[in-house]
Amino acid sequence: MSWNKIIECVPNFSEGRDLEKIDQIVAPFRIKAGVKLLDYSNDEDHNRLVVTLVGEPEALYEAIVEAVGVAVRLIDLNQHTGQHPRMGAVDVIPFIPIKNTSMEEAIELSKKVAAKVAEIYHLPVFLYEKSATASHRENLASVRKGEFEGMAEKIKLPEWQPDFGPAERHPTAGTVAILSLIHI
């Protein structure tokens, strides 16, 4: 890896049981030039997949957008059970500046991904942590409160209009929270 700029990303997907789906979700991270898949782990009890990858900002952007599309296509939260709180097929997408990148660049990447996944997959997106647009959205627990089932009503409230995308929960994929932070 002789990349000039590196950002880490640790997306969490609401699938931890179906290995075929997991392989399809992770596939864009394996094949995209400029992206390195560092690790992924699934938990059957939580029904959750956590992926850790690093990459150049533009390559990371492309791989994340593709993986979100796979998750939206494969995961139906109406059929989802698990011990971990969740509000979306892709629950959270954190971006962490690692090398020759600033927090501002990570925030810009989070907004670019948010705009794109909202546009092409019709997902409502909330920005939180360092990317938050309002103080009541900085904490993930506040954003996620109500989870998938309660988000259909919550998202109608003026203070919970999404930062990007439609002001209604996606019928099967829910909502997604995207953020930038200093470290995990």
Predicted regions: what they are:
Residues 62-131:
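A generic, well-ordered mixed alpha/beta core segment in the N-terminal half of proteins
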Residues 182-184:
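Conserved small/polar residues in nucleotide/adenosyl-binding loops
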Residues 146-164:
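Acidic, His- and aromatic-enriched active-site or binding-groove loops in soluble protein domains
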Residues 94-104, 108, 135-152:
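Short, low-order "capping/linker" segments at domain edges
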Residues 13-17, 54-60, 96-103:
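A generic structural motif
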Residues 2-26:
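N-terminal amphipathic/basic leader segments beginning at the initiator methionine
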Residues 39-56, 83-98:
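Short, charge-patterned binding micro-sites
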Residues 2, 25-50:
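N-terminal glycine-rich anion-binding loops that anchor highly charged ligand groups
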